[in-house]
Protein backbone atom coordinates (compact mmCIF):
# COMPACT_ATOMS: atom_id res chain seq x y z
CA UNK A 1 0.00 0.00 0.00
CA UNK A 2 2.87 2.33 0.86
CA UNK A 3 4.49 1.60 -2.50
CA UNK A 4 1.24 2.41 -4.33
CA UNK A 5 0.87 5.69 -2.44
CA UNK A 6 4.49 6.61 -3.15
CA UNK A 7 4.12 5.78 -6.84
CA UNK A 8 0.92 7.84 -7.05
CA UNK A 9 2.64 10.81 -5.43
CA UNK A 10 5.56 10.62 -7.85
CA UNK A 11 3.28 10.31 -10.88
CA UNK A 12 1.13 13.22 -9.71
CA UNK A 13 4.20 15.46 -9.59
CA UNK A 14 5.35 14.63 -13.12
CA UNK A 15 4.03 15.98 -16.43
CA UNK A 16 2.54 13.34 -18.68
CA UNK A 17 1.25 12.98 -22.20
CA UNK A 18 -2.48 12.71 -22.83
CA UNK A 19 -2.00 9.10 -23.96
CA UNK A 20 -0.13 8.16 -20.77
CA UNK A 21 -2.75 9.86 -18.62
CA UNK A 22 -5.61 7.98 -20.28
CA UNK A 23 -3.84 4.64 -19.78
CA UNK A 24 -3.93 5.12 -16.00
CA UNK A 25 -7.61 5.95 -15.62
CA UNK A 26 -10.96 4.20 -15.93
CA UNK A 27 -14.05 5.80 -17.50
CA UNK A 28 -17.50 4.40 -16.67
CA UNK A 29 -20.95 5.25 -17.96
CA UNK A 30 -23.20 5.55 -14.89
CA UNK A 31 -26.74 6.56 -13.92
CA UNK A 32 -28.40 7.86 -10.78
CA UNK A 33 -31.94 8.94 -9.92
CA UNK A 34 -33.11 12.50 -9.23
CA UNK A 35 -36.77 13.40 -8.79
CA UNK A 36 -37.85 10.05 -10.20
CA UNK A 37 -35.82 10.60 -13.37
CA UNK A 38 -32.77 8.57 -14.40
CA UNK A 39 -29.79 10.85 -15.00
CA UNK A 40 -26.91 9.65 -17.24
CA UNK A 41 -23.33 10.53 -16.48
CA UNK A 42 -19.68 9.55 -16.73
CA UNK A 43 -17.39 8.68 -13.83
CA UNK A 44 -13.65 8.88 -14.43
CA UNK A 45 -11.29 7.60 -11.75
CA UNK A 46 -7.73 6.34 -11.20
CA UNK A 47 -7.16 2.63 -11.66
CA UNK A 48 -6.06 2.19 -8.04
CA UNK A 49 -6.84 3.57 -4.61
CA UNK A 50 -9.28 5.91 -2.92
CA UNK A 51 -9.02 9.68 -3.07
CA UNK A 52 -10.90 12.95 -3.44
CA UNK A 53 -13.97 13.27 -5.64
CA UNK A 54 -15.10 16.16 -7.82
CA UNK A 55 -18.61 16.82 -9.11
CA UNK A 56 -18.42 18.84 -12.32
CA UNK A 57 -21.44 20.99 -13.26
CA UNK A 58 -21.91 22.25 -16.82
CA UNK A 59 -22.91 25.70 -18.01
CA UNK A 60 -26.05 27.07 -19.60
CA UNK A 61 -28.49 25.81 -22.18
CA UNK A 62 -28.04 22.42 -23.85
CA UNK A 63 -24.37 22.14 -22.81
CA UNK A 64 -23.89 18.46 -21.95
CA UNK A 65 -21.65 16.55 -19.54
CA UNK A 66 -18.62 16.97 -21.83
CA UNK A 67 -19.37 20.68 -22.36
CA UNK A 68 -20.38 20.01 -25.95
CA UNK A 69 -23.43 21.78 -27.32
CA UNK A 70 -25.66 21.27 -30.37
CA UNK A 71 -25.40 25.04 -30.79
CA UNK A 72 -21.64 24.88 -31.40
CA UNK A 73 -19.57 22.72 -33.77
CA UNK A 74 -17.07 20.17 -32.48
CA UNK A 75 -16.99 17.42 -29.86
CA UNK A 76 -13.69 18.19 -28.10
CA UNK A 77 -15.48 19.20 -24.91
CA UNK A 78 -13.41 20.69 -22.10
CA UNK A 79 -15.18 18.78 -19.31
CA UNK A 80 -14.08 15.43 -20.70
CA UNK A 81 -10.52 16.68 -21.05
CA UNK A 82 -10.56 18.15 -17.55
CA UNK A 83 -12.04 15.02 -15.97
CA UNK A 84 -9.41 12.81 -17.59
CA UNK A 85 -6.57 15.14 -16.59
CA UNK A 86 -7.73 15.27 -12.97
CA UNK A 87 -8.31 11.51 -12.79
CA UNK A 88 -4.71 11.03 -13.93
CA UNK A 89 -3.77 13.16 -10.93
CA UNK A 90 -5.73 11.10 -8.43
CA UNK A 91 -9.16 12.76 -8.47
CA UNK A 92 -12.36 10.84 -9.26
CA UNK A 93 -14.63 13.06 -11.38
CA UNK A 94 -18.36 12.74 -12.01
CA UNK A 95 -20.00 14.72 -14.78
CA UNK A 96 -23.56 14.29 -16.02
CA UNK A 97 -26.11 15.53 -18.53
CA UNK A 98 -28.25 18.09 -16.75
CA UNK A 99 -31.92 18.53 -17.69
CA UNK A 100 -32.43 19.21 -21.42
CA UNK A 101 -28.86 18.35 -22.38
CA UNK A 102 -27.22 15.28 -23.90
CA UNK A 103 -29.21 12.15 -23.06
CA UNK A 104 -31.27 13.80 -20.30
CA UNK A 105 -34.68 14.83 -21.71
CA UNK A 106 -35.54 16.68 -18.52
CA UNK A 107 -39.13 17.46 -17.56
CA UNK A 108 -41.81 19.73 -19.06
CA UNK A 109 -39.81 22.86 -19.80
CA UNK A 110 -42.38 25.16 -18.18
CA UNK A 111 -41.66 23.34 -14.90
CA UNK A 112 -37.90 23.89 -15.11
CA UNK A 113 -36.47 25.89 -12.19
CA UNK A 114 -33.12 26.43 -10.54
CA UNK A 115 -34.20 23.80 -8.03
CA UNK A 116 -34.36 21.25 -10.88
CA UNK A 117 -30.64 21.69 -11.46
CA UNK A 118 -29.88 21.77 -7.74
CA UNK A 119 -31.79 18.55 -7.12
CA UNK A 120 -29.98 16.78 -9.96
CA UNK A 121 -26.64 17.97 -8.58
CA UNK A 122 -27.62 16.89 -5.07
CA UNK A 123 -28.40 13.36 -6.27
CA UNK A 124 -25.11 13.33 -8.19
CA UNK A 125 -23.29 14.38 -5.03
CA UNK A 126 -24.77 11.47 -3.09
CA UNK A 127 -23.87 9.05 -5.88
CA UNK A 128 -20.28 10.30 -6.00
CA UNK A 129 -19.87 10.05 -2.22
CA UNK A 130 -21.11 6.45 -2.32
CA UNK A 131 -18.40 5.26 -4.70
CA UNK A 132 -15.59 3.08 -3.35
CA UNK A 133 -13.02 5.17 -5.25
CA UNK A 134 -14.00 8.30 -3.32
CA UNK A 135 -13.22 9.46 0.20
CA UNK A 136 -16.66 10.84 1.20
CA UNK A 137 -15.03 13.40 3.47
CA UNK A 138 -13.16 14.91 0.50
CA UNK A 139 -15.78 15.64 -2.13
CA UNK A 140 -15.65 18.93 -4.05
CA UNK A 141 -18.05 20.58 -6.48
CA UNK A 142 -16.99 22.69 -9.48
CA UNK A 143 -19.33 24.75 -11.63
CA UNK A 144 -18.42 26.23 -15.00
CA UNK A 145 -20.07 29.44 -16.25
CA UNK A 146 -23.77 29.21 -15.26
CA UNK A 147 -22.79 25.98 -13.53
CA UNK A 148 -21.15 28.22 -10.92
CA UNK A 149 -24.64 29.32 -9.88
CA UNK A 150 -25.73 25.70 -9.50
CA UNK A 151 -22.58 24.84 -7.54
CA UNK A 152 -23.23 27.76 -5.21
CA UNK A 153 -26.83 26.76 -4.62
CA UNK A 154 -25.80 23.15 -4.00
CA UNK A 155 -23.28 24.34 -1.42
CA UNK A 156 -26.03 26.36 0.27
CA UNK A 157 -28.21 23.28 0.73
CA UNK A 158 -25.59 20.51 1.09
CA UNK A 159 -22.64 22.36 2.56
CA UNK A 160 -22.05 19.71 5.21
CA UNK A 161 -21.22 17.22 2.44
CA UNK A 162 -18.90 19.44 0.40
CA UNK A 163 -15.19 19.93 1.15
CA UNK A 164 -14.70 22.84 -1.24
CA UNK A 165 -16.30 24.76 -4.12
CA UNK A 166 -14.59 25.73 -7.38
CA UNK A 167 -16.15 28.50 -9.48
CA UNK A 168 -14.72 28.31 -13.01
CA UNK A 169 -15.39 31.13 -15.51
CA UNK A 170 -18.42 31.84 -13.33
CA UNK A 171 -20.48 35.04 -13.24
CA UNK A 172 -20.14 37.40 -10.29
CA UNK A 173 -22.99 39.60 -11.52
CA UNK A 174 -26.65 38.83 -12.03
CA UNK A 175 -27.72 37.76 -15.51
CA UNK A 176 -29.76 40.96 -15.71
CA UNK A 177 -26.69 43.11 -15.17
CA UNK A 178 -24.57 41.05 -17.56
CA UNK A 179 -27.21 41.30 -20.28
CA UNK A 180 -27.48 45.05 -19.88
CA UNK A 181 -23.73 45.48 -20.29
CA UNK A 182 -23.38 42.99 -23.15
CA UNK A 183 -26.31 44.40 -25.11
CA UNK A 184 -24.94 47.90 -24.77
CA UNK A 185 -21.34 47.04 -25.67
CA UNK A 186 -21.66 44.24 -28.20
CA UNK A 187 -24.80 45.09 -30.14
CA UNK A 188 -25.48 48.79 -29.87
CA UNK A 189 -21.79 49.62 -29.55
CA UNK A 190 -21.09 47.94 -32.89
CA UNK A 191 -23.83 49.87 -34.69
CA UNK A 192 -21.76 53.08 -34.96
CA UNK A 193 -24.12 55.02 -32.73
CA UNK A 194 -23.21 58.02 -30.61
CA UNK A 195 -23.10 57.54 -26.81
CA UNK A 196 -26.30 59.56 -26.55
CA UNK A 197 -28.07 57.34 -29.08
CA UNK A 198 -26.88 54.19 -27.30
CA UNK A 199 -28.17 55.47 -23.97
CA UNK A 200 -31.54 56.38 -25.47
CA UNK A 201 -31.85 52.85 -26.89
CA UNK A 202 -30.82 51.23 -23.61
CA UNK A 203 -33.30 53.01 -21.32
CA UNK A 204 -36.34 50.90 -22.37
CA UNK A 205 -34.17 47.74 -22.45
CA UNK A 206 -33.09 48.26 -18.84
CA UNK A 207 -36.66 49.03 -17.85
CA UNK A 208 -37.89 45.83 -19.50
CA UNK A 209 -35.26 43.67 -17.79
CA UNK A 210 -35.89 45.15 -14.37
CA UNK A 211 -39.66 44.87 -14.76
CA UNK A 212 -39.23 41.23 -15.76
CA UNK A 213 -37.07 40.49 -12.71
CA UNK A 214 -39.70 42.17 -10.54
CA UNK A 215 -42.27 39.63 -11.75
CA UNK A 216 -44.05 41.53 -14.50
CA UNK A 217 -44.90 40.11 -17.92
CA UNK A 218 -42.90 41.96 -20.56
CA UNK A 219 -43.22 42.04 -24.34
CA UNK A 220 -39.63 42.12 -25.67
CA UNK A 221 -40.77 44.02 -28.76
CA UNK A 222 -41.80 46.91 -26.53
CA UNK A 223 -38.20 47.25 -25.32
CA UNK A 224 -36.41 47.66 -28.65
CA UNK A 225 -36.74 47.68 -32.41
CA UNK A 226 -33.34 46.01 -32.74
CA UNK A 227 -34.03 42.40 -33.87
CA UNK A 228 -30.97 41.02 -32.06
CA UNK A 229 -32.05 42.56 -28.77
CA UNK A 230 -35.61 41.35 -29.22
CA UNK A 231 -34.35 37.81 -29.91
CA UNK A 232 -32.17 37.77 -26.79
CA UNK A 233 -34.91 39.15 -24.55
CA UNK A 234 -37.42 36.71 -26.03
CA UNK A 235 -35.14 33.77 -25.17
CA UNK A 236 -35.22 34.92 -21.55
CA UNK A 237 -38.80 36.14 -21.23
CA UNK A 238 -40.95 33.83 -23.36
CA UNK A 239 -43.78 32.27 -21.30
CA UNK A 240 -42.30 28.79 -21.77
CA UNK A 241 -39.04 29.63 -19.96
CA UNK A 242 -39.99 32.79 -18.04
CA UNK A 243 -39.97 31.02 -14.69
CA UNK A 244 -36.34 29.95 -14.74
CA UNK A 245 -35.36 32.99 -16.79
CA UNK A 246 -36.59 35.23 -14.00
CA UNK A 247 -34.76 33.16 -11.38
CA UNK A 248 -31.49 33.37 -13.30
CA UNK A 249 -31.85 37.08 -14.05
CA UNK A 250 -32.38 37.93 -10.39
CA UNK A 251 -29.79 35.63 -8.79
CA UNK A 252 -26.84 37.53 -7.26
CA UNK A 253 -23.82 35.18 -7.48
CA UNK A 254 -21.33 37.21 -5.43
CA UNK A 255 -23.77 37.71 -2.58
CA UNK A 256 -24.59 33.99 -2.55
CA UNK A 257 -20.92 32.96 -2.81
CA UNK A 258 -20.16 35.00 0.30
CA UNK A 259 -22.38 32.65 2.28
CA UNK A 260 -20.67 29.38 1.29
CA UNK A 261 -19.16 27.79 4.41
CA UNK A 262 -16.58 25.68 2.56
CA UNK A 263 -13.36 27.09 1.05
CA UNK A 264 -13.79 28.50 -2.46
CA UNK A 265 -11.43 28.60 -5.44
CA UNK A 266 -12.25 31.12 -8.17
CA UNK A 267 -10.68 30.30 -11.56
CA UNK A 268 -10.69 32.66 -14.51
CA UNK A 269 -9.18 32.75 -17.99
CA UNK A 270 -7.35 35.84 -19.18
CA UNK A 271 -8.74 35.37 -22.72
CA UNK A 272 -12.35 34.91 -21.55
CA UNK A 273 -14.64 37.37 -23.34
CA UNK A 274 -17.84 36.05 -21.76
CA UNK A 275 -16.94 36.42 -18.09
CA UNK A 276 -14.91 39.39 -16.89
CA UNK A 277 -11.89 38.96 -14.57
CA UNK A 278 -12.78 42.14 -12.67
CA UNK A 279 -16.56 42.43 -12.79
CA UNK A 280 -17.20 38.72 -12.29
CA UNK A 281 -14.23 36.87 -10.78
CA UNK A 282 -13.21 40.01 -8.91
CA UNK A 283 -16.63 40.40 -7.35
CA UNK A 284 -16.69 36.77 -6.23
CA UNK A 285 -13.28 37.09 -4.57
CA UNK A 286 -14.12 40.44 -2.96
CA UNK A 287 -17.41 39.13 -1.61
CA UNK A 288 -15.64 36.18 0.01
CA UNK A 289 -12.92 38.36 1.53
CA UNK A 290 -15.44 40.89 2.81
CA UNK A 291 -17.30 38.05 4.53
CA UNK A 292 -13.98 36.77 5.95
CA UNK A 293 -14.42 33.46 4.16
CA UNK A 294 -11.62 31.32 2.70
CA UNK A 295 -11.00 32.07 -0.97
CA UNK A 296 -8.20 31.51 -3.49
CA UNK A 297 -7.96 32.96 -6.98
CA UNK A 298 -6.21 31.60 -10.06
CA UNK A 299 -6.03 33.65 -13.26
CA UNK A 300 -4.89 31.55 -16.22
CA UNK A 301 -3.41 34.11 -18.66
CA UNK A 302 -3.99 32.16 -21.88
CA UNK A 303 -7.26 30.35 -21.05
CA UNK A 304 -10.50 31.25 -22.82
CA UNK A 305 -14.01 30.76 -21.45
CA UNK A 306 -13.89 26.97 -21.89
CA UNK A 307 -10.38 26.71 -20.37
CA UNK A 308 -8.62 26.11 -23.70
CA UNK A 309 -5.32 27.79 -24.56
CA UNK A 310 -5.91 30.85 -26.77
CA UNK A 311 -2.69 32.21 -28.35
CA UNK A 312 -4.25 35.31 -29.91
CA UNK A 313 -4.37 38.64 -28.09
CA UNK A 314 -7.53 39.64 -26.27
CA UNK A 315 -8.05 42.40 -28.80
CA UNK A 316 -7.89 39.91 -31.68
CA UNK A 317 -10.33 37.61 -29.91
CA UNK A 318 -12.82 40.40 -29.27
CA UNK A 319 -12.59 41.49 -32.90
CA UNK A 320 -13.93 38.13 -34.08
CA UNK A 321 -16.18 36.66 -31.41
CA UNK A 322 -17.94 34.31 -33.83
CA UNK A 323 -14.65 32.67 -34.78
CA UNK A 324 -13.83 32.17 -31.10
CA UNK A 325 -17.08 30.50 -30.09
CA UNK A 326 -17.25 28.24 -33.15
CA UNK A 327 -13.70 27.09 -32.37
CA UNK A 328 -14.31 26.33 -28.67
CA UNK A 329 -14.49 22.57 -29.28
CA UNK A 330 -12.23 22.25 -32.31
CA UNK A 331 -10.38 18.90 -32.28
CA UNK A 332 -6.85 20.32 -31.98
CA UNK A 333 -7.47 22.59 -28.99
CA UNK A 334 -6.13 21.72 -25.53
CA UNK A 335 -6.71 22.83 -21.96
CA UNK A 336 -4.50 25.47 -20.35
CA UNK A 337 -1.93 23.41 -18.41
CA UNK A 338 -1.53 25.88 -15.56
CA UNK A 339 -5.25 25.82 -14.85
CA UNK A 340 -5.37 22.02 -14.64
CA UNK A 341 -2.34 21.92 -12.34
CA UNK A 342 -3.69 24.69 -10.11
CA UNK A 343 -7.03 22.93 -9.73
CA UNK A 344 -5.44 19.56 -8.96
CA UNK A 345 -3.11 21.14 -6.39
CA UNK A 346 -5.95 23.01 -4.68
CA UNK A 347 -7.91 19.79 -4.30
CA UNK A 348 -4.84 17.97 -2.96
CA UNK A 349 -4.18 20.78 -0.46
CA UNK A 350 -7.73 20.67 0.88
PLM features per residue range, with description:
Residues 17-53:
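N-terminal cap/lid segment of alpha/beta-hydrolase-fold proteins
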Residues 48-50, 54-85:
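Short, surface-exposed "cap/lid" segments of acyl-processing enzymes
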Residues 78, 111-131:
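Alpha/beta-hydrolase active-site loop
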Residues 123, 127-133, 137-189, 193-194:
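Primarily recognizes the serine-hydrolase "nucleophile elbow" in alpha/beta-hydrolase
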Residues 166-259:
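Accessory cap/linker subdomain of secreted extracellular hydrolases
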Residues 260, 266-268:
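Short beta-strand/loop motif that positions the catalytic acidic residue
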Residues 273-279:
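Conserved alpha/beta-hydrolase "acid-adjacent" motif
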Residues 306-307, 312-350:
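Catalytic active-site module of serine/aspartate enzymes centered on a nucleophile-bearing elbow/loop
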